Amino acid sequence: MKTLIVSGGNVGKEILNKTIKNNNFNNIIAVDKGLEILDECKIQPNYIIGDFDSVNQKIISKYNEERTIKLNPEKDFTDTHMAIKLAIEKKSDYIVVLGGIGTRIDHTIANVHILKECIENKIRCEIIN
């Protein structure tokens, strides 16, 4: 199973559309602000996860709460880390993360570090910036 995780970093329409076109994703997970670019491109995520501190509330209100996972803003992990855990739980064997690097150094370091969790679970994972 292939999963695309769209995080809150800088993701352009071109790279998003190219990544989707070149892969046959079974699941798309929007992470907090990552929902905005998916919404702009009219791409429906299967899951939305985050503490929703950075996404436009008008956008998130358009989506089904049934597939929305709201996280506590006071936590010891990033929203993207929880998206990786969700992808692993859904039996993904290939995970692509868009927008996981660049905007915040603490999140960049954490997101690179969570690749270890994929390796430990024998899951192919890549971060595309």
Q: Regions from the language model: what does each represent?
A:
Residues T68-K90:
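Short phosphate-binding loop-to-helix
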Residues P45-N46, I95, C125:
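Hydrophobic anchor at the start of a short beta-strand
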Residues D106-K116:
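Short Gly/Thr/Asp-enriched flexible loops that form oxyanion-binding sites at enzyme active sites
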Residues I69, I95-G100:
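Short glycine-rich or small-residue beta-strand-to-loop segments that form or flank ligand, phosphate
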Residues K116-N129:
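Class I SAM-dependent methyltransferase SAM-binding "motif I" and its flanking Rossmann-like core
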